[in-house]
Amino acid sequence: MGLTFFDKARELTEELEKTQAENIHQAAKLVAESIMNEGIIQAFGSGHSYAAAIEVCGRAGGLIPSKVIMDPAGGYYESIEGVGSLLTHRLQAKPNDIFFLISNSGRNPMGIELAEWIKAQGCKLIVVTALDASQTAASRHSSGKLLYEFADVILDNRSVQGDAALELDGLEGKVCGTSSFSAVLLLQQTIYEAVELMLEKGYTPPVYRSANIDGGYEYNFAIEDKFADRIFHL
């Protein structure tokens, strides 16, 4: 048996810990500053990157002032210029908000147009991407830009071109994409460090409790109510 996904996961975990520690710390500082100044987290990922976006929004152990930006087409139109700009008409942002945009290639117009809009609102932007792969990709947007170029902080998921990482005898292509796994590690560590920073500053961070434990729903609802006009805005 060759390299398995468990092997690759261990390898990636060590690589991310070694190479992304400082970037994670910088991202965590931005998140902490946003939350302590009444901002909210907004996260977007098209296609499979949506799985990473919901890692930081509305889940147990995450920060309550957060919302996922829904892609109504599930990624089918991410390569069509203008679709991202249309999506921004449904969004709202305040200067203290912080955004996560997750895209493995960072080349599609949808993410690029969202990034342009986010920066125009004066908000901080954290991009999760495969940096090496993105830097060698051709942009699909007429501006020629790639998503990472808009970032205040880049979290590099260290995925390979095409995402799939493992080879099997008898198979021409590769299997097992790694970007989702890497994104979860990067994002959860960022939230952990952000919460730690807030506590160090004497600020009690609003963290979700599981709705499936007694009292969790009531606890969450009481805090969500303070942010309802922001986190439930469609």
From Swiss-Prot:
GO terms for biological process: carbohydrate derivative metabolic process. Residues 31-205 form the SIS domain. GO terms for molecular function: carbohydrate derivative binding. It holds the Pfam family SIS_2. PANTHER family: PHOSPHOHEPTOSE ISOMERASE, SEDOHEPTULOSE 7-PHOSPHATE ISOMERASE / DNAA INITIATOR-ASSOCIATING FACTOR FOR REPLICATION INITIATION. Belongs to the UPF0309 family. NCBIfam families: PRK02947.1. This is UPF0309 protein lin0024.
